[in-house]
Amino acid sequence: MPTANPTPAGLASPPFCEEDYLRFSRLVAERFGLFFPEKRRNELEFGVRQAFLASTCPDFNSYFAVLNDSENGPLELERLVNHLTIGETHFFRDSGQFDALANYVLPGIIIRRRTTRTIRIWSAGCASGEEPYSIAMLLRDLVPDIDSWTIMIYGTDVNTRYLEWAKRGVYGQRSFREARAFTYRDRFFKQVNNQYHLHPSIRRMVTFGQLNLAEDRYPSYETNTMFMDLILCRNVTIYFPESVTRRVIQRFYQSLCPGGWLVVGHSEHSLGTYQRFHTHNFPNAILYQRPLEDTPAAQERPAPPEAARLPARSGAGLSPKAAADNSKMEVRVEQRKPDPISRRYRRGRTTGLLVLPSLAVKSVPASQPANAIEEAQSLLASGHADQARDLLKRWIDQHPDDGKA
């Protein structure tokens, strides 16, 4: 197993010539989707040189050959990408996006999933874990009975070194830069000297795994990337060429359940990359949502917030005729007695914190099967096959004449 470069101490490593730049840049683009144009040449050289010095290879020619070797290549490629990727992040990074998540997106998901009590969230390119842990802390506040829910927060990164740091849940001062982060630090961290140890209750909410976004291994059950309610991939695709970014965003679209949300960084590629999504403009944030239906008509109109769908579920226990009558009624959400989540969701709509699309708030026809099917898929994805079957059976019993079921 390669451990250290035998180059004698004090001697310089080989020069990084034009040929080296071209072949190594092609290699990392093909394997990891990472784009190193001429202006980033020094970054590529530094990363390659650091990984090379950790190998047993005498020169760049032999090192390049090892990277392409079927036996030793995977280990050396892992070491190389660990030196090439940047893990700069901190808790609740980008306050505008987290305001939108805390006041609108997450409360809407919670309302929508109240029946199944399952939520699936993916932090793609999570680096050292601050982002998925931030989401976990928000959910601790937003879901009063969280222990009765099945919440899956999945953090992935191509850099295994960062993932090990994330699993430890130990952070320094630089991870706390936002005002919201200091509030949660006092509640969910224990200070030990100059480090902050995350509370086990938050660490248990997040699982981590290695995933190369440039590969086509997702969405799949194998990678646990199906039926997501929310995907965050911020400041990751800025290192990809546009062609790779388009493929990644298309896979994210397929990984999301209908109505699921995508959060990307402000500097990501935007040349039509997100045209299949609904675009939602919030103060200091733009978020994307997969339409509830993949039809041209659905793509032309804004997707309603999930609170508007609550009245349809109020007819779940009614007879088919009563449920059908209920589906024709126009319902104002404000007339319903709000629980804490609904109040928080509505507060975001009325205090000027958020800018929502113009909506006609009506209940969804009770004969529409998409909601039940979507929830059943979510249950299946989280291992609750019996609950999924029971949910669909109840829907069929209530809608015996609907052939779509």
Model-predicted regions and their roles:
Residues 2-122:
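Conserved AdoMet
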Residues 124, 145-232, 236-244:
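Extended basic-aromatic, gly/pro-enriched interface segments that bind polyanionic ligands
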Residues 128-146:
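Conserved SAM-binding loop of SAM-dependent methyltransferases across substrates and taxa
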Residues 246-258:
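A short glycine-rich, Lys/Arg-flanked "PGG" loop and its adjoining helix->strand segment in the class I
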Residues 258-266:
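Conserved beta-strand signature within the Rossmann-like core of class I S-adenosyl-L-methionine
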Residues 278-328, 333:
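Core SAM-dependent methyltransferase catalytic element
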Residues 361-401:
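Alpha-helical segment of the N-proximal tetratricopeptide repeat
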